[in-house]
Amino acid sequence: MGFLEEKKILVTGISNKYSIAFGIAKALHKQNATLAFSYHTDRLKNKVYELAKELGVKIVIPCDVSDDNSIKRLFFNISKKWITFDGFIHSIAFAPKNQLSGDYVSSITRLDFSNVLDVSSYSFVGMAKACRSILKKGSSLLTLSYIGSKKVVPNYNVMGIAKASLESNVRYMASCMGLNGIRVNAISSSPIKTLSSYHIKNFKKILNHTTSRSLNNNLTTVEDVGNTAAFLCSDLSKGITGQIIYVDGGFNITAMSNSE
């Protein structure tokens, strides 16, 4: 019997079998959670259905988080299947490729800035707002961040601003929803090799630097993030809310590695 037995959790942001969201889904499934998946576009539909079948997931629903009505439909459909549920994984971020390289000030536009923060940050609180009435007491809401929210990472640019906004969202949401027994946290992991990560210019250089500066000199894996997410979705972590949990081998505290 897993420690997520009888928990019903929605996982968003799955795009392929290598995605962090699917790694989290596998960890939740391993602990016997009942899952639902959402997907963004029809282009992803068949792939997400395949991955859902792999884990025995019965509920797969489209959702465009830039559209409030689409978010409302997502949770209306969830409520028809589950009535109430125990939380969701927000693994959603977006930035045009041209915003992930070069000079931040020169390349940024008002439209891109607005769209990136809307999809990458507002969507988290927008989803919470839409499903608040059907969340059980003791539910857990979890999102994914990165150290680029606090420190400058070359080429991360507007995504750093979006992640800073997202982390502030976590704190204010935790404050608002705590009286309902709902916890809100984020995982901030090291860079992980996924298809989307390679949109960031010089990603391999960032990856190698992070690994060399980590205290254990190891790459952070999707499994590392998934196991932490499973814990944060469980009652084992009921005393943790409003936190940014680092899963980065200690990189965030390191000014200089032992090998330097």
Swiss-Prot record:
This is Enoyl-[acyl-carrier-protein] reductase [NADH] FabI. The active site is at Y146, Y156. The keyword Repressor does not apply. Substrate binds at A95. It holds the Pfam family adh_short_C2. Belongs to the short-chain dehydrogenases/reductases (SDR) family. FabI subfamily. Its EC number is 1.3.1.9. Disulfide bonds: none annotated. Pathway: Lipid metabolism; fatty acid biosynthesis; Cofactor biosynthesis; biotin biosynthesis. Homotetramer. GO terms for molecular function: enoyl-[acyl-carrier-protein] reductase (NADH) activity; identical protein binding. It catalyses: a 2,3-saturated acyl-[ACP] + NAD(+) = a (2E)-enoyl-[ACP] + NADH + H(+). GO terms for biological process: biotin biosynthetic process; fatty acid elongation. NAD(+) binds at G13, S19, I20, D64, V65, I92, K163, I192, K193, T194. It comes from the Bacteria. The record marks K201, K204, K205 as: Involved in acyl-ACP binding. SUPFAM superfamilies: NAD(P)-binding Rossmann-fold domains. The keyword NAD applies. Keywords: Biotin biosynthesis, Fatty acid biosynthesis, Fatty acid metabolism, Lipid biosynthesis, Lipid metabolism, NAD, Oxidoreductase. The lineage of its organism: Bacteria, Pseudomonadati, Pseudomonadota, Gammaproteobacteria, Enterobacterales. Catalyzes the reduction of a carbon-carbon double bond in an enoyl moiety that is covalently linked to an acyl carrier protein (ACP). Involved in the elongation cycle of fatty acid which are used in the lipid metabolism and in the biotin biosynthesis.
